[in-house]
Each structure stands twice: as C-alpha cells, then as structure tokens.
A protein has these predicted regions:
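Acidic-aromatic/histidine active-site loop/patch
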Residues: 100
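N-terminal glutamine amidotransferase
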Residues: 1-71, 75, 107, 116, ...
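Short, surface-exposed helix-loop/turn micro-motifs enriched in polar/charged residues
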Residues: 91-92, 145-147, 203, 291, ...
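Non-catalytic, surface-exposed connector residues within folded enzymatic/regulatory domains
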Residues: 94, 190, 204-205, 320-321, ...
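ATP-dependent adenylate-handling active sites, centered on carboxylate activation for C-N bond formation
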Residues: 8-13, 87-88, 106-115, 119-120, ...
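Cytochrome P450 catalytic domain signature, combining two hallmark sequence patches
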Residues: 88-96, 202-209
Length: 363
C-alpha cells in the first residue's frame, strides 16, 4: 500500500510534498516528488512508498526514456510477462511499476497527437471538452495497453509532450483514487482525501445527499464521497486531463477499459467445475505472493481466510518460498473462530500469531 497524490493547475512542490506527507502512513519506506512548470500552471506528482518488490530500486516518481512520469499505488502481477514481451525497452528497474510506462511508450506514445489548447465547458463540478464522454475521446486510445495489465492499481501518468495526465484504477477498484476540482480550476488527486487537506484552497464540506444515500442503502450507489465535489475515479476506468490557456484542468476523455460480465453458470457440475474453481483460486494466491518482503495472512477461522491460508502453504511449498505467517484476533480464547483458526494452523504447521483483546479495553 503506497500513497500517491498530485496537482494539475495551481500548485508547487511545497504543497504537493505536504499533501504526500498526509499519506505517509501508507508508505513509510520512501518519498519522492516531481514538479514541472507549464506555460500557465504546473503539474506536481508525489508518492509515499511501501516497498514490496525491488526494495532498493523502483523509487517514484519514475521517469521513462520518452520523458513521461509515473506514480503508482498497487502491484502489477504479470510484470515479468510484460517485460519479456517488450524487449527493446531500456528498463531502469527490476520492479513492476515501470511496465506501465513501457506499455504506454509502445502502444500510445508512437501514435499520439500533438498538443492542442483545449476548449472546456463547466459541467457540474468539472470542466470538460465537448467530446470527453463520446466514443473516440482521448482516453480511448489507452484502452488496449491498459487492458494488458493484470493486478491492482491506482496510477497517474504525465506525458509532457502533449500535456496529458492519465488517471486510472484497476478493474475491481481495489486501489483507491480520488479527485476534486478547486474553484480556480485546479485538479487535486490522491489515494486518500486526506491529502487534499494540505492544499490551502481545499475546503472540506459534507455532501448531505451522499450521506443520506449511505444511510439508506449502507453502500454508495455512484462515485460520490461524503465530501462535496470529491469523487472517486471509477474502477476499470481511464481518465485523461490536460490544462487550458488559463491554467485550468480540463477532462478530455473518460472510458471503461474493462466491462466483464460474470454470470452464474446454468449447469454446475461439482465433480468437474470445483477443480477449475480451485485452480483459479490457486493461481490468484500464487500471483499475490509476489513480494521481496515477508507476506502474512489474516486468518479469521472462516472459510475464505482458511482457503487462502491453506493455498498459501501449498503455493509456498511448490515454489520453494517462505510460508506466510498467519494472524488471528479474538476477544476470547474459546471463541469458535479462534479454535477453528488454531486447528487449521496446526494442520498446515503454520506459524500462528494469536492476539486476545480484553473486552475491558473497549471501555
């Protein structure tokens, strides 16, 4: 878990560094920032890093040989496969994030347009070009290469030659990415809304309508947040932004690159299909054990976490990896879930960390 943040419009390194400082709890292993003045306004990017792969390398922001800049939060599970397919790219790191820049260079950079000063119109809380929501908009050209990524991510990529900022989230929206447009047209974005508080022009106001929806349905129905004019970048979505002649951020494109529809099978054969399901889950666990640091499993004692813990053991044994430790928290040593977790940990000979919380501590 890293923390990324940035500004397109009225900002500087002092402000973006403070914004990133508000996310230091997400990434204590390193900090980096980038600032570039534009004709009017500026682009600022920053990251607080939690190092998981390529511990001593892969510092961010990462700059590519085609002069694009990236900050990313997440993991790209198929980065080794992508690296093997893009052999002519001058790799600077052994980490996973750089594959985003390599794909951008190969599929988007060579056929890109020249920079044109956008004409934006205020639509709700945003400033958009007239074609931003139409097929063939600026974000559409990135669908093919982003679709090659397998993982979880929220990233921001700045292309200085056409002054284009790409904001993107993974298909399931595992990694967060929020944005807001200030009254002067400045775009703020980050892994947490908390980062916006460091910008002197941001004013946190409640969104009463969004709050009412949460209370009624207990989950959001759209991409609004409890803060007025602060929204999430949608899962499986690419947004492209640029800056106009007045230094205001303009949305030039928005597109979904992933719209998979998962429907229940009409006929379920447990003798055949259960093995397919288990193999898929095994492959998913195998991908998520990609790490240069120790990995652990939170073991509640329920079916889901028990499956993950058991498969982690099997994957580790087959790959010669260190078996992940498991952790269980309960309010009582005789809690049924704790007993189930102990039983599973003993069965698989897992290093089990048990924490009993005294109920009196809650008062």
């Amino acid at each position: 878990m890293c923390g990324i943040t940035g500004i397109l419009g009225n900002g500087d390194s002092t402000v973006v560094n403070s914004m990133s400082g508000n996310l230091s709890h997400r990434g204590p292993d390193g900090f980096g920032s980038f600032e570039s003045d534009l004709v009017v306004g500026s682009i600022c990017l920053a990251q607080s890093r939690l190092a998981i792969v390529d511990i001593n390398g892969s510092k961010q922001p990462i700059e590519s040989e085609h002069n694009c800049i990236l900050v990313q939060n997440g993991e790209i599970y198929n980065f080794q496969k992508i690296k093997s397919e893009i052999q002519n790219y001058p790799w600077k790191t052994s980490g996973d994030s750089e594959t985003i820049l390599a794909l951008h260079r190969k599929y988007a950079y060579e056929n890109k347009k020249t920079y044109e000063i956008p004409v934006g119109k205020k639509v709700g809380s945003l400033i958009k070009t007239k074609d931003a929501d139409k097929p063939g908009n600026d974000a559409d050209k990135h669908r093919s290469w982003v679709s090659k990524l397998d993982g979880v991510w929220g990233f921001a990529l700045w292309d200085p030659q056409i002054r284009e900022l790409i904001l993107c989230r993974d298909p399931m929206g595992v990694k967060p990415l929020f944005r807001t447009l200030l009254p002067d047209g400045t775009l703020l974005f980050g892994s947490e809304i908390k980062s916006f508080y460091a910008h002197p022009e941001f004013q946190a106001k409640p969104d009463i309508n969004a709050l009412a929806v949460r209370l009624a349905f207990e989950y959001p129905l759209d991409y609004t947040t409890l803060f007025s004019n602060v929204t999430s970048v949608a899962q499986g979505t690419i947004e492209t932004w640029t800056i106009d002649k007045e230094g205001k951020a303009v949305l030039t494109g928005i597109t979904r690159y992933n719209q998979e529809k998962v429907s229940p099978e009409g006929n379920w054969n447990p003798n055949l299909d259960a093995e397919i399901l288990l193999k898929s889950l095994y492959n998913g666990v195998e991908s998520r054990l990609m790490s240069d640091v120790p990995v652990g499993v939170v073991l509640s004692g329920g079916l889901d976490s028990s499956l993950i813990a058991g498969l982690s053991k099997k994957v580790s044994d087959s790959k010669g990896l260190e078996t992940p430790d498991v952790w269980t928290v309960a309010g009582d040593e005789n809690n049924p879930d704790m007993l189930a977790a102990i039983s599973l940990a003993e069965h698989y000979e897992l290093n089990h960390h048990k924490k009993i919380i005294d109920p009196e501590k809650f008062w």
